[in-house]
Amino acid sequence: MTVRVSWDGLEIAGPCAAGPLRRETSVVEVRDGLLSPWLVQMVPDLTRCPAITLDRPLGADRAFLAWAAQVAPFPVGPVPEPPDFRKEVTLEFTGVGVLPRYRLVAAWPAAYEVLDQPDGLARERLTLVHEGFERLDDAVA
């Protein structure tokens, strides 16, 4: 299944493959020492969203590289104040039937790689760290 990716209102060129969207909540065990000191209850604790990886064929579009360069610019001369590199990213899964769209909240690139595949095609990979995601109600057909 491929994914169409957009940020800043622009669709990024080329079909992408995306890693899984996951939300993980850690569990804490607590005891109520007054009522039953030997009974343990499990409650939710901190929720984390692991990074997602976008993978696409290497082409002329420089959107992945340009965004990654905003986070860690190559220092030449005085280092300017970094721009706001966090973006709202929309992932639109393409396939058969009605598929949902998701929005990554405050996403930013943590890694950018250019990979040489055994089939001879170069690919680029962008790893996005984000603060969470939400499903958008307007599904596409």
Predicted regions and their residues:
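Glycine-rich, low-complexity intrinsically disordered segments
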Residues: 1-141
